[in-house]
UniProtKB/Swiss-Prot annotation:
This is Neurexin-1-beta. Residues 1-45 form the signal peptide. The gene is NRXN1. It holds the Pfam family Laminin_G_2. Residues 413-467 are cytoplasmic.
Amino acid sequence: MYQRMLRCGAELGSPGGGGGGAGGRLALLWIVPLTLSGLLGVAWGASSLGAHHIHHFHGSSKHHSVPIAIYRSPASLRGGHAGTTYIFSKGGGQITYKWPPNDRPSTRADRLAIGFSTVQKEAVLVRVDSSSGLGDYLELHIHQGKIGVKFNVGTDDIAIEESNAIINDGKYHVVRFTRSGGNATLQVDSWPVIERYPAGNNDNERLAIARQRIPYRLGRVVDEWLLDKGRQLTIFNSQATIIIGGKEQGQPFQGQLSGLYYNGLKVLNMAAENDANIAIVGNVRLVGEVPSSMTTESTATAMQSEMSTSIMETTTTLATSTARRGNSPTKEPVSQTTDDILVASAECPSDDEDIDPCEPSSGGLANPTRAGGREPYPGSAEVIRESSSTTGMVVGIVAAAALCILILLYAMYKYRNRDEGSYHVDESRNYISNSAQSNGAVVKEKQPSSAKSANKNKKNKDKEYYV
């Protein structure tokens, strides 16, 4: 298209196309708008691209109240009810998930992630138990205001705790736990990952430790049993129940729990969907899909009022409405955390920089912000949407091309009519000149003037000059 337009401009600029100066001016008439329109289209596309950048800056502070590590979550975990939140009020409550008897898993590795806010110093958040008689379990708890995990997969109780982070401050926190055999890792928010490697780094060494606890007099029968048991010392056998809330353990949790993920199960989402394998008892109330991350003042007020349902509900509603309206001049920014952050962190616990540019089902990752400041948290994602920018650029280029074609057609039409008029005028002049040459009378009238000039030349020749 552009080559054809250039050829048309060259023809108009040639001597046979309407004059060199006029053709040059005509070329400028459509080249300049073409350039300007193209730049406009590119600028439009660039502005669309810039409008869809979400910049989250990286910081270095460790003391904060929301998660910073955002990992790539599997595609199967990005739908559904993201960030389902339950409030456990005064008196405690409990959400229990039971595996069907014929579908109880035995796992060598486990992954657990959950968001919460509370002011309690002692509570049990989540506990997973094996079938009756096996004794395997995994428990996430708060002890003296510190978060920790305790589990047993066939030998002794193994404990791991984050002793540096205070989590009973009423702020929103995220905890991630992974287990592989007897080894475990624990991370709270953006604090460094804590690793726990118990004595006996392989099955044989751990089997030897277990054998020492069995009386020797039991003999060969026990040895054979230990050999079989040794292959299971790293396996969480026949998991039967997931208990959320700690009421059954005598340490009921009071506060908010959000987005629980355990080995592919999003239990709180299932509870909100009235799953047949889930039972809810006690003072437990569903809040909504967006976990409310409350400020220190609002959460402390709610907790000091004995976790009143009405106060907690009002605070949560206020936080949710504030998040929808955006940052208010008089309110602190409200952070939001979706299940994508929790679930993905459990799926990829060793990769802190694997950030997903794709969008969650609800329209983008949340922007974690500090509860008492304006600065975003480190490790956040930069999400770029290029579809709108591409559309804007294409529309701009098409508009520029259409405008240039219209200008070129109008200019060609105008100069074509002007050239035809000039041709008629030149033809009439040639006709008058030819008629004058063919008219004998007119020629005769001009003959006396020619005779006079001849006589004058003769007189000049007759003159004599003297020096």
